[in-house]
Swiss-Prot record:
Residues 1-45, 58-117, 999-1081 are annotated as: Disordered. The chain crosses the membrane at residues 165-185, 201-221, 473-493, 867-887, 894-914, 919-939. Disruption phenotype: Decreases cellular chitin level. Decreases capsular diameter. Increases extracellular vesicle secretion. PROSITE patterns: DEK_C. Its EC number is 2.4.1.16. It comes from the Eukaryota. It holds the Pfam family Chitin_synth_2. GO terms for molecular function: chitin synthase activity. Glycans are attached at N407, N713, N836, N1055, N1161. Polymerizes chitin, a structural polymer of the cell wall and septum, by transferring the sugar moiety of UDP-GlcNAc to the non-reducing end of the growing chitin polymer. Produces a large proportion of the chitin that is not deacetylated to chitosan. This is Chitin synthase 4. Belongs to the chitin synthase family. Gene3D superfamilies: Cytochrome b5-like heme/steroid binding domain (3.10.120.10), Homeodomain-like (1.10.10.60).
Amino acid sequence: MPPTSSQAPFHRYSHLDQRSAPDTQESSPADGNHDPRRQSTSFDHPNLYAQRDVFAVPNHPQSTNLNHQPYLHQGRSGSFEEPIYETPQPGHNVGYEDAEPYGHEQHDGTMWSERPSYSAPYDSDIKAPLDPTPYTPDLEADGMVVKEKKVHATEVMATTNARRWWIRITWMMTWWIPSFLLVHLGRMKRADVRMAWREKLAIFMMICLACAVVLFYIIFFGKLLCPDSDKAWNEKELATHQGDDDYYAAIAGKVYDFTNFYKAQHSDLSSYTTSSALMLEFAGQDLTNYFPMPMTVACPNLVTSTDLTLMYSNFTPIVQYAVHTSGPLQTGTDTKLNDINWYTDTLNPALEDYYKGYYVYDKSSIASGADSDSKYWAIYNNKVYDLSNYIYTISYYSSSSGTDLPNYSFLNSDITDLFQTSAGQDITKDMDEKLSALTAEDAANQMTCLNNAFYLGELDFRKTPRCTVQNYLLLAFSIILIATIASKFLAALQLGSKRQPELLDKFVICQVPCYTEGEESLKRTIDSLAALNYDDKRKLIFIICDGNIVGSGNNRPTPRIVLDLLGVDDKLEAEPLLFKSIGEGSKQLNYGKVYSGLYEFEGHVVPYIVVVKVGKPSEISKPGNRGKRDSQVLLMQYLNRVHFDAPMTPLELEIYHQMRNVIGIDPAFYEYIFQVDADTSVTPDSLNRLIACTADDQQIIGICGETKLANENESLTTMIQVYEYYISHHLTKAFESLFGSVTCLPGCFSVYRIRTAEGGRPVIISSVVIDEYAEPNVDTLHKKNLFSLGEDRYLTTLMMKNFPTFKMKFTPDAIAHTVAPSKWSVLLSQRRRWINSTIHNLVELLFLPEMCGFCFFSMRWVVFLDLLGTIILPATCGYLIYLVIVVSTGKAAIPVISLAMIGATYGLQALIFILKREFMLIGWMLVYILAFPVWSVFLPIYSFWSMDDFSWGNTRKVIGEGNQKTVVIDDDEPFNEGMIPYRTFKEYEWNAWEAASLHSESPAPSEKSQRTTRTGQSYRPHPHSIRSPSFHSSASELPSKADYWRDSSPLGMGNESKRLHQVSSDPSMRGDKSFIRGSKPQVERVQSMAGMSMWGSGSVYDPYKQAMGGPGFLHPMMTGNSLASQATFYPPQTQYPMSMYGSPMMMPMGMPMMGLQYAGNASMAGGAAGPRGTMMTMGMGDQSRISSFSMGGPVAESGAGRLVGLSINEEKEVQDEEVLDKLKTWLSKQDLMSVTKRQTREAIYTLFPNAGLQNRAGWLNEQIDKILSES
């Protein structure tokens, strides 16, 4: 009797027994309704069910005296029996406790799905939900279970030196907050939670300090160094104050504001009245000569004559009566100016109310005045003295004589000579020497006279180093920032039309992690991936459902929504399989289900894999959920083990089987991972553009495109995000791409290279990257923000850290659209995660040992600027508000540098829009500017203070940190690595073969045919070592030694005739009529394959009927139904069964690809039977147009892979014309998008086996190019 699926050793949990092959027994039917799938399976292993649940029992003993009794599990596609304990063992949990009622909704709107009922009969119509575990008998209710107590353990871990120093700094900054307040008021019972709060507070204080330092340095530090810098005016600056409401003037080296004075009538002489119009003529000028001090008052003890007055060398008053002469020289009567002390007693006290600052001169103007205007002025002790009028007066009266003339030479002659010989210079040193030669009284008289009569103002102290150092530093930083802005502008200014790359043929995995997204969002994402302008056979949609969870607004769990969208029959239920997740304690043990199939959308038929993480039976809250990082690591770890042919978990083995045996593509073929979020839709040409960039530059290991908003007009919240999304790509990422170091490749739209193009070195699947990225102990604030909040950014950081010589790039040509948060609360939560993860990741990047560039021209400097810019965002907004206030109130000069930076920032951005003719972005920029306080103040401050806002696990608790970290482990279900069995796929297939060989005619393959391991490069099975159990009579024909590159060729490099002869000489390889018509021997032979069918029991595909040519030759995927994960494998070193595309993707040499011409119609979704009954596969059109070489099939005389219409010429001498004719004929029948030159040459070699055309490969290549160019 043929074996059934339940007899296979690859039962969903039989992988736990790695010691021996199972002993399969056949049960006799009790009646005519016997279900052939019901078979009892006995195991050498003591208790399979207990072994499966060993994660709940630490150090589970392997008892061998347990009786095995079959127990039938029902309620899913295919039943199976498992032994249970007849006599329970103390302390062993052999069954799962019934859960509390479930299906309840949480406070955040998330509803957890109900656990299924497994008591329904096998043929029940009850819809089977995504149950996390198989049925478990309620053994505890029967008193058969002794519950295990919690396991308490203490683990001491060493802390790094950096961590120890950070803890010290944290306590230094937060020591003033006692812990008992955090315990009682803050309700922080755990030490690690309190430590994270202290770290958060310390970081927040540092950020506030940084903002305060920036504002202090920009606004106040300069004033400390140069206190009166805003209280000094030179001649040009004073001239700017000539308005009606801005009336400044200088008198005797001091500046006064006469705005509230000049309009009043201040003259006490009726004959000389004033007016505001007349007063405005004096605004903004130095009025010292209009207020001469009597010389007897200005120079006491030196001038005794009240008649002495000085002549002006270069001064003409606007009106003569504006000169305020006081004392005896005043000609008017009844005026206050008649008082000789009017200047000191009346004028000076009145001017004090209008005083503003100093009237200053710089050295250059003093020097030029001495040269061009012949002024006799000089600098002494930073004060400017002008003796021009004094020297002019002496010269004027030098020819006069008389005893009544005053003594005009009242100053010391040495001082006068010094001013004449050193005019325009600083004479401080010489002046001190002259004064020291005088008596103290005489020197004092000389200085009093100079200060009262000849003082003009101060040397401009704003030009001194003390006052200029601040401005120069700000200018230097401004230049660097403006240069960075300009570089970003140039990076974004990529004019010209989009490039149109040719369609590439690289194999790509489209990874889509999903959590609680809705049906509309998921459908939009899946449809966009299916509609990509990329070869459908070379892209794989890989969806990972992170838990069996009902999202807010959904009526079904997210995995159910995904499977319904893909057309999976809800009656098909996969079995949960073990794998290791990222988590604490028992959370590391997880179960997942695998589904595969084809998804059809608008003419595209794309294979898919769906992995549903369903969790352990004991999980009630969010079963299976481990986070997005775990979903990414699941695929990365799987591809890593595929690459190195390493032992895999049961879930990974099932994925391998589905990809290799069901879909028909070896997972080692895939070269790229296309990461797309479940709320993101990609444009049709996006993937090909991203892959084209990596194909052009093999140094690129990661690349992203531009992400735009799909709902930009939905709400005000989305509107303020449009421009922010644009500049984050076209300025930030475009600039970083110049260095080849994009610091954040978003997980919603990025491509990573799986392995390098040269050498096959693993990249994103590198063990180093995975080990760091899969860190399970996330117990500090820094790790929480890296791994829990910003996993996508940290993955990019790890790639840059471990592959510093490679490039991370950005291309604006590839575009995707994502759904931005439309509610303020959602945006707040998103930006909190993004901002905090950005800070922690930038800190990590700062300390990477190898980053391109040097000093200010390095990526490290750019990262520092980004980090500083993120931290001081609130200070930036505060400074802008300050500028607006001081400029609008006129209390300070216009900050030209600051305004130039702002203008450069937004002006260059606007120029980009204009040049690219994206004028709408100018409007979005204005919206962004109006919302600038939100982006720079509210969101950052909220994010900084909420840096410790995340969940803490209860399994691992850190109770103390110092030189060592003490961790208390408190777990109901302790985890150890031995709970998960690991096998290589070769071993897994071998066990499957051994089990099937008990009921098969074919012996097991020899050891020589087993797949060998290749380390360090991607590896595919040798076609010659892959044999089908039902098509090969023995394993003796398997070659003992294989050449990878030779055997991966559709035809091989030699011995073609030998292999063809082997095929034709084997009766099982001939497409005889008895098989075609479904004769009894072949029908029995096909029926004997049922136990090894990849579709397994419960599948909608019936291999018996299809082999007989029955109606509707439909692959289950072609009808919209999906293949649930079935534990059915083909034996090792055997050829894959028919793939989802209707033909083997990798056939061994000499094996007919589609040689079996069925009697029935081969109708499929997207294909139909050809005129000769030949299979026409979906997505490929007429089979006659498809090259057998491009499909991996051989050139044989039988089967669909034969050279139709072409005969083999065995002559040694052939004409070139004949070769060209057959070359043209052969190419006309091929799919030119997939056929290669090598396949074409191999076909010609086969058509002319004795012509020696192998030596004319170059000539053949030229003819191929010529024919293609002419077609």
